[in-house]
Regions:
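Membrane-proximal basic amphipathic "stem/tether" segments
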Residues: 1, 120-148, 220-268
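N-proximal low-complexity "stem/linker" segments adjacent to membrane-targeting elements
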Residues: 1-18
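Short, acidic, metal-binding catalytic loop of nucleotide-sugar glycosyltransferases
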Residues: 21-30
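Active-site-proximal specificity loops/subdomain of glycosyltransferases
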Residues: 38-76
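Short aromatic/hydrophobic "clamp" motif used to bind/position activated sugar donors
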Residues: 82
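The conserved acidic donor/metal-binding loop of glycosyltransferases
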Residues: 86-90
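Conserved donor-nucleotide/metal-binding helix-loop-beta segment in metal-dependent transferases, i.e.
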Residues: 91-124
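Catalytic core and acceptor-binding pocket of nucleotide-sugar-dependent glycosyltransferases
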Residues: 135-215
Length: 268
């Protein structure tokens, strides 16, 4: 049995609408969809049909909170495998859970740290080493908006790190990565259960997906592209007027900063 687990939040609901449509229209090989949202935001999922809705604890920083939800998703799912999906991912015609398997095993993509180390290696090796007590030989962040894991792996990870939620709450926003941690755990403890592939040594597998995320939300250009796959927004906007105003304010602030940065570059 294969579960799909999607961790969302109130500002991603418009994307989730399209993601769920694409799963039902295009993705083959799954048995259930579990949608997780922070406690207190359940009303934003009132238009979701034929999914199981669960809640996760509220974090001061939900960027870390959503990662912890994925690490602990074995508490919510029924399947013996779980496809963890970003809510802004769209599955295209021909998509199948089999896309994430090779020789019957979930595929884990790796990328060796360069020599000499680049900024990415310098940043992530000690962050991963802080949790594990040793540094990894490669990065495990390679992915396409969806990753397949065995439920037993998540259970084992949780047993090995029973205080991972408390640990996460103490970490800075950009010093926690659920997929770096899971990947290294698999590398150390369960390499026989997965196919670990270095992206520099093998051809890239074909994934029938596209990630449409845009800091400006769902633009007309994005809508036109999605319409080619018969995907159209179906849910009304669930954000409050205040949340909509805050989103617009952030967009204006970001564009203003970009404009000032472009001016400073021209003057240098």
């Amino acid at each position: 049995m294969v579960s799909i687990f999607i961790r969302t939040y109130k500002r991603d609901i418009a994307w989730l609408d399209l993601c769920l449509q694409s799963i039902r229209n295009n993705l083959k090989g799954w048995d259930e969809i579990v949608v997780c949202i922070p406690e207190g935001q359940e009303h934003h999922l009132r238009y979701a049909k034929d999914v199981r809705i669960v809640t996760s604890p509220v974090f001061p920083n939900d960027y870390i909170g959503q990662q912890v939800s994925k690490l602990l998703c074995h508490h919510y799912i029924k399947g013996d495998m779980v496809l963890i999906v970003d809510s802004d991912l769209v599955f295209l015609p021909g998509a199948s859970v089999q896309d994430y398997l090779e020789n019957g095993k979930p595929r884990i993509l790796t990328n060796k740290w360069p020599v000499p180390a680049d900024k990415l290696a310098i940043k992530w090796r000690p962050i991963i080493g802080k949790l594990f007590g040793k540094e990894p030989p490669c990065s495990f962040m390679q992915g396409h908006g969806a990753r397949l894991f065995l439920k037993s792996t998540l259970q084992s990870f949780s047993a090995h790190f029973p205080d991972i939620e408390a640990y996460a709450r103490k970490q800075p926003r950009k010093e926690f990565s659920e997929f770096q941690f899971l990947g290294f755990f698999i590398y150390l403890n369960e390499p026989q259960n997965y196919l670990l592939l270095d992206i520099n040594e093998v051809p890239m597998a074909q994934y029938h997906t596209q990630q449409f995320w845009n800091v400006d939300g769902i633009t007309k250009i994005t809508l036109d592209e999605l319409a080619q796959y018969n995907l159209h927004p179906q849910w009304p906007n669930t954000l409050s007027p205040w949340d909509q105003f805050r989103r617009q304010l952030r967009q204006v602030t970001r564009r203003t900063k970009q404009w000032f940065n472009s001016l400073s570059h021209k003057n240098t």
